């Protein structure tokens, strides 16, 4: 029963198909506003479906089409179709393929809208009534006339034929490949097809034959080297050859000649080149010449001449990109039509055909951009297409107007068209318009070079030829002027120093040289011709200041990129733009000394200005020592204070005294914060385990001590700050200041005699000694010291209260000292600011006419306790005396009774707050000092100090050092280290950075390194395919298949150095095995090189 039912359903399906046909095939009616279509059920459904998936952007008339399935392959069908009311007018169409998806999109004549779409998977087949509906994956597509070839991921090649009315049929199915089809190409007609597969073979199919077997099989090697792309060279047909190019995963470019006599099988290419390191993913042949462009995973685009008359093994031109290149294509049409802007000159096509065609490339790893390059300016993209989603594939579109259009496929299901001539497309950028006309860069010798270049005057052949044109009358004038300046030349040459390369002073009207006293002069601006020679302009000494204006009537020569432009070996070449060369052997009739007065030369091409600035502080030895020996992390057993002191000693060893003092100041500040119980106590080192071992009783005792000291310390700090401000104001206005200064010096001397830490070095040494102890012992001693100070503070307070209560008119007590000092200008705050001052010091405060009588009539005994926490630079501003006077008058007027105390005593008892009730912040706190030191270092350009501080303190004080600042400093520092070839220091900086900073730095500076080894004799790339596949044994970089010679042999045993090799010396360059050299030098006790070069190693 089941068989008749199934047979009936199949017949019903066939009957329905014969009535309605394929909806997509019959839906070939254009839009209603263009031509009135015939009314039919199929056409109406097709229009609804087309409008559902296609959309048109009205801003820039961009064609967009959204598919219902994932797409990955793209091609263009150039065959006239008569669909609906179009009678052969639709000549350019799009073929899109993907996962179970293959459609033909009929595009309008203006290529701005989709007229109809045809589902090729529903086409008729010569093998069955309908093509198979199994799940297929179209990996590549190629078209020729009315034929469409589709390469599938299962190794099958399907051939479709499209009729003029839009209907299609499967006419061929070939399945001789075992893996995915990566590339397809037709040979001169629609009857011969090439297919390159992942299985490492290229097969030639005859589509006219009834056989499904290939006519020829091509293989680059005996092993299966996957083929990424292959293409037939139409230029070889002139020499009656059938040339095919292919690129492989091994990085090889192979050239095959299909005229073989080996029975339809080719196992070796005619020629083979290794242009890339790693897999080559794409190739495309130039439309006019025998040049091929290839792109690979090594982020390079190579342009190579594969003709028979060339013998080069390296690319003719190389373009470095920022990502792996997955697709590369020459443009379809030459650049004969350019958009001319107001500031751009109308340029004619370049006679070099390579410059007339652009190169477009797309990138791997889901990159959403397509870059368009031109070999005339290959260092920067001409245009960049920015897509909203990653680009899957692209082609240059052909059209009737020959405009520059690119069709793209974006992941997962979007087709878009971009017009590169359109100036209003926001998704197409032109990087050259965003760059400045003047650029500069530094080299490793602390010199820089500036280049001024017009935006659209680059590599103009006609301009280079015009520069070399000569005029005899100008030649005579120039030579006479040059001979008149001979004396000036010799005097100028004698005034220079005796250095190997003497550089003249840069005399330009707009240049300021702040260092005129140095004997090393900056070279003059160097103008270059198209051939790379210097363009000499003889001028008189009096007119040397008008150099920037000497090219107003004639153009400056253009910048050519060759190896000679970076080297200047004589002083005459550097004096070319200022004064004529002194040597009489110069040929003034040579082209580089002649000018051109043509109006074509009014443009100003690139102008090179090398400048040498002697900066004494920028020393290579100092930079290398600071970057190598400065600690950027905390080693085991050290604290942060120790690290700061070590960095201070490193800076002092290179006479960088200010940086050394800053490091010492940070160390003292960190120690001070630690002693005052600040939160920065944790930055002194990873000692949490030791702290946890302290008994509970000690913690409780410390807590009580800190609580008891908090109020007294605040009062003591207030007394110190108020007294310091009061005494300073008193010294500036009092007539008896010398007596006060003398007495104050006695107090200072008394403090210095009682404690040896009265200067900065003693404080640093003490901080270093304290930090070197263990945390337990240090804190126990700290507890005993604080308890002792607490008792002294309590006794001192009781004594003051007793004096102020029972002896209101008692004089101020003055502590005597047997010695006297003569330095009367010593600051009064020195005795009050030392870290380990005595418990109390008596100070005499004489009266002055500046203050009121009430303040001076009732002096009291004021004793100031300078404890451990009365540190250096703790001068918070106190309320002025006028504030106290106003408060006193207000209290008197209100009848408030006050004790007969002096205004200074009341001021000293005030809380350490301002008028708004906010606590005063010390400007010399650790965070404040750190921020100020970083600001100054950044202003001075001290990148080493900024980077070192960022590595040490970024995770400790994130509110002081922002993430942006840390990244900026470390990035600049790493770039400078890499430029100076200090790679170990650069890697150490990345390793010592915090996790979030390290992750971002690794993305920028820790990329994979690719090494390419070349033969030291024949300069060929060491691939060794012959040795690998012939079974001769292991061969690596020590052997070359091209010249059959070993590369590196041991100088002692004459065997290949396959592993670790030791170089005897940099002068002789001989190398050998470690064991061999150990036997020669250590066991045999030889001192010279075993190679016989008489080089004394020891």
UniProtKB/Swiss-Prot annotation:
Which residue numbers delimit the RING-type Zn fingers?
A: 1050-1093
Give the compositionally biased regions (Polar residues).
47-57, 535-562, 731-742, 806-816
Q: Name one Pfam family in it.
A: WD40
Localization, per the record, is: Vacuole
Spans of the WD repeats are: 131-170, 176-215, 222-266, 275-314, 367-417, 432-473, 635-673, 891-934
> Signal peptide position in this chain?
none
List where Low complexity composition bias occurs: 32-46, 563-593, 768-778
**Presence of the UniProt keyword Thylakoid in the record:** no
Give the molecular function GO annotations: zinc ion binding
Ranges where the record places region Disordered: 26-57, 535-597, 731-843
The entry's cellular-component GO terms read: cytosol; GATOR2 complex; vacuolar membrane
Which CDD domains does this entry report, sorted A to Z?
A: mRING-H2-C3H3C2_Mio-like
Alphabetical UniProt keywords: Metal-binding, Repeat, Vacuole, WD repeat, Zinc, Zinc-finger
* One GO term (biological process): positive regulation of macroautophagy
Q: List the disulfide bonds.
A: none
User: Which InterPro entries has this protein been placed in?
Assistant: WD40/YVTN_repeat-like_dom_sf, WD40_repeat_CS, WD40_repeat_dom_sf, WD40_rpt, WDR24, WDR59_RTC1-like_RING_Znf, Znf_RING
Biased segments, Basic and acidic residues type: 779-804
Q: Which family is it part of?
A: Belongs to the WD repeat RTC1 family.
Known function? May be involved in a process influencing telomere capping.
**Record protein name field:** Restriction of telomere capping protein 1
The record lists the organism as Candida dubliniensis (strain CD36 / ATCC MYA-646 / CBS 7987 / NCPF 3949 / NRRL Y-17841)
């Amino acid at each position: 029963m089941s068989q008749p039912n199934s047979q009936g359903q199949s017949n019903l399906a066939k009957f329905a198909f014969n009535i309605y046909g394929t909806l997509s095939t019959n839906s070939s009616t254009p839009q209603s506003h263009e031509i009135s279509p015939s009314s039919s059920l199929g056409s109406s459904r097709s229009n609804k479906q087309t409008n559902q998936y296609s959309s048109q952007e009205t801003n820039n008339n961009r064609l967009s089409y959204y598919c219902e399935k994932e797409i990955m392959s793209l091609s263009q069908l150039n065959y006239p179709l008569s669909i609906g009311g179009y009678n052969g007018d639709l000549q350019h169409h799009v073929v899109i393929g993907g996962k179970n998806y293959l459609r033909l999109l009929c595009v309008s004549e203006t290529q701005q809208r989709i007229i109809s779409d045809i589902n090729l998977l529903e086409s008729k087949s010569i093998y069955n009534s309908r093509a198979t509906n199994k799940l297929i994956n179209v990996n590549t597509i190629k078209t020729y006339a009315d034929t469409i070839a589709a390469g599938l991921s299962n190794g099958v090649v399907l051939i479709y034929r499209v009729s003029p009315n839009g209907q299609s049929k499967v006419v061929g199915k070939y399945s001789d490949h075992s893996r995915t089809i990566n590339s397809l190409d037709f040979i001169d007609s629609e009857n011969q097809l090439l297919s390159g597969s992942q299985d490492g073979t290229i097969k030639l199919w005859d589509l006219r034959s009834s056989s499904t077997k290939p006519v020829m099989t091509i293989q680059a090697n005996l092993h299966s080297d996957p083929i990424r792309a292959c293409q037939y060279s139409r230029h070889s047909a002139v020499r009656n050859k059938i040339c095919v190019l292919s690129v492989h995963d091994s990085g090889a470019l192979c050239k095959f000649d299909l005229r073989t006599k080996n029975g339809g099988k080719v196992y070796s290419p005619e020629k083979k080149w290794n242009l890339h390191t790693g897999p080559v993913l794409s190739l495309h042949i130039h439309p006019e010449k025998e040049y091929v462009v290839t792109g690979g995973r090594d982020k390079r685009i190579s342009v190579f001449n594969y003709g028979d008359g060339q013998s080069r093994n390296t690319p003719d031109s190389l373009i470095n990109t920022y990502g792996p290149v997955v697709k590369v294509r020459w443009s379809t049409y030459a650049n004969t039509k350019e958009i001319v802007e107001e500031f751009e000159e109308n340029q004619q096509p370049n006679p070099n055909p390579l410059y007339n065609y652009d190169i477009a490339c797309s990138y791997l790893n889901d990159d959403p951009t397509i870059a368009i390059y031109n070999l005339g300016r290959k260092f920067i993209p001409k245009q960049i297409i920015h897509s909203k989603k990653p680009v899957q594939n692209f082609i240059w579109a052909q059209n009737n107007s020959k405009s520059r259009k690119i069709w793209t496929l974006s992941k997962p299901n979007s087709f878009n068209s971009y017009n590169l001539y359109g100036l209003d497309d926001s998704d197409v950028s032109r990087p050259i318009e965003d760059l400045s006309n003047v650029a500069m860069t530094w080299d490793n010798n602390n010199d820089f070079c500036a280049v001024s270049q017009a935006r659209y005057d680059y590599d103009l052949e006609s301009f280079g030829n015009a520069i070399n044109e000569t005029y005899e009358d100008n030649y005579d004038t120039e030579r006479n002027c040059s001979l008149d300046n001979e004396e000036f030349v010799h005097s100028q040459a004698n005034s220079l120093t005796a250095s190997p390369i003497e550089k003249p002073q840069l005399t330009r009207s707009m240049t300021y040289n702040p260092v005129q006293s140095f004997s090393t002069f900056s070279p003059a601006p160097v103008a270059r011709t198209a051939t790379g020679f210097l363009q000499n302009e003889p001028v008189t000494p009096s007119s040397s200041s008008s150099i920037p204006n000497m090219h107003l009537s004639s153009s400056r020569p253009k910048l050519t990129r060759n190896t000679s432009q970076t080297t200047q070996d004589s002083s005459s070449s550097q004096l070319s733009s200022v004064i004529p060369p002194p040597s009489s052997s110069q040929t003034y009739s040579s082209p580089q000394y002649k000018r051109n007065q043509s109006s074509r030369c009014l443009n100003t091409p690139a102008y090179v200005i090398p400048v040498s600035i002697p900066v004494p502080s920028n020393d290579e030895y100092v930079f290398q020592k600071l970057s190598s020996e400065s600690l950027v992390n905390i080693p085991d057993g050290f604290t942060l204070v120790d690290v700061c002191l070590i960095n201070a000693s490193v800076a002092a060893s290179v006479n960088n005294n200010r940086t050394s003092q800053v490091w010492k100041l940070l160390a003292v500040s960190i120690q001070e914060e630690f002693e005052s119980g600040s939160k920065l106590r944790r930055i002194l080192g990873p000692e949490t385990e030791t702290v946890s071992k302290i008994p509970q009783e000690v913690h409780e005792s410390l807590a009580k001590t800190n609580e008891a000291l908090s109020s007294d310390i605040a009062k003591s700090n207030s007394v110190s700050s108020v007294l310091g401000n009061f005494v300073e104001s008193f010294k500036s206005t009092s007539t008896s200041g010398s007596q006060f200064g003398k007495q104050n010096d006695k107090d200072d001397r008394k403090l210095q005699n009682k404690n040896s830490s009265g200067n900065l070095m003693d404080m640093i040494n003490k901080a270093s000694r304290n930090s070197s102890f263990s945390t337990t012992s240090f804190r126990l001693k700290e507890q005993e010291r604080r308890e002792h100070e607490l008792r002294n503070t309590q006794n001192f307070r009781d004594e003051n209260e007793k004096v102020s209560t029972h002896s209101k008119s008692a004089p101020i007590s003055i502590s005597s000292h047997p010695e006297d000092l003569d330095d009367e200008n010593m600051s009064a705050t020195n005795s009050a600011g030392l870290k380990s001052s005595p418990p109390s010091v008596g100070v005499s405060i004489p009266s002055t006419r500046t203050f009121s009588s009430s303040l001076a009539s009732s002096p009291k005994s004021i004793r100031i306790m300078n404890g451990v926490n009365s540190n250096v630079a703790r001068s918070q501003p106190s309320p002025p005396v006028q504030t106290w006077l106003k408060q006193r008058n207000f209290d008197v007027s209100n009848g408030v009774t006050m004790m007969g105390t002096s205004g200074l005593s009341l001021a000293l008892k005030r809380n350490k707050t301002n008028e708004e009730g906010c606590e005063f912040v010390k400007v010399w706190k650790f965070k404040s000092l750190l921020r100020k030191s970083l600001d100054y270092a950044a202003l001075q350009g001290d990148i080493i100090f900024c980077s070192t501080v960022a590595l040490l303190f970024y995770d400790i004080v994130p509110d002081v050092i922002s993430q942006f600042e840390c990244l900026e400093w470390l990035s600049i520092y790493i770039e400078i280290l890499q430029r100076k070839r200090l790679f170990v220091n650069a890697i150490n900086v990345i390793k010592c950075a915090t996790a979030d900073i390290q992750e971002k730095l690794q993305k920028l500076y820790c990329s994979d390194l690719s090494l390419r080894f070349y033969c030291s004799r024949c300069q060929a790339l060491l691939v060794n395919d012959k040795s690998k596949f012939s079974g001769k044994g292991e061969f690596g970089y020590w052997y070359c298949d091209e010249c059959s010679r070993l590369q590196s042999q041991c100088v002692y045993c004459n065997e290949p150095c396959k592993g670790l090799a030791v170089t005897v010396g940099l002068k002789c360059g001989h190398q050998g095995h470690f064991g061999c050299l150990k036997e020669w030098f250590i066991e045999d006790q030889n001192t010279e090189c075993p190679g016989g070069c008489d080089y004394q190693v020891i």
